[in-house]
Amino acid sequence: VVVGLSGGADSVCLFLILEELRKKIGFEILAVHVNHGIRGEEAKADEEFVKTLCEKKEIPCRSVSVDIPKMAVEYRMSEEEAGRTARREIFEQAAEEWGGTRIALAHHQDDNAETFFLHLARGSGLRGLGGIYPVNGMYIRPLLCVGRKEIEDYLKGREMPYCIDATNMEDAYMRNRIRNHVIPYFKENINEKTVEHMNRSMDQLREIWDYMERQTESAYQICTCLLYTSPSPRDS
């Protein structure tokens, strides 16, 4: 399993859980850290934290540096999109070179709620409103069933430190604005369990989409079969 390890609370939690499961099940782990070239010394400190954690747990670690601002300009995309693209390429390359069959990412319920708002605002259809899938190809997201607070409480209980990305508190990115303002507003003024309820709705939307996909494929196969088995006009 290739695990994305930024050093933040979410990825550290996932790393520790996989490390515990590794002892019981017997699979191998490769931690991959991506330095986005944005936060200077803070990013270097995160990288050192990740390397130290992996050494302590005797888990191999691969660290890759990318100039995300430069990549964003070259490919005419936002830094958020450039970061996602770079991470995906790095994780998949690591999996291919190392022989990994799964890539584990630390998305959780709060991330999924943010994604729902983003997709809703952009006019996404049923597939997009289903949010993040727990399993999508070789990608797995074991923490999608828990929230950010549960993750932080888990780390606190284990007395495990983690890195804090100060840019997450800035409103420079749309996702940050949703995280820092929209979701807190819903929790405080509408329903304190907004995130949990949204994730439940997204689960149902994913089930509906998957059902429609299966039914569409089944109908297509029937139509194809009828097309190739129907007698031609000359035979009638």
Name each model-derived stretch.
Residues E159-P161, T224-L227:
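Short acidic (Asp/Glu) and glycine-rich catalytic loops that position anionic groups and cofactors
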Residues E217-T224:
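An N-terminal amphipathic alpha-helical segment
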Residues V1-H181:
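Core alpha/beta nucleotide-donor-binding catalytic domains of modification enzymes
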Residues Y228-S236:
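Single conserved hydrophobic/aromatic residue that forms the stacking wall/gate
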Residues K187-Y211, Q215, S230:
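An accessory alpha-helical subdomain
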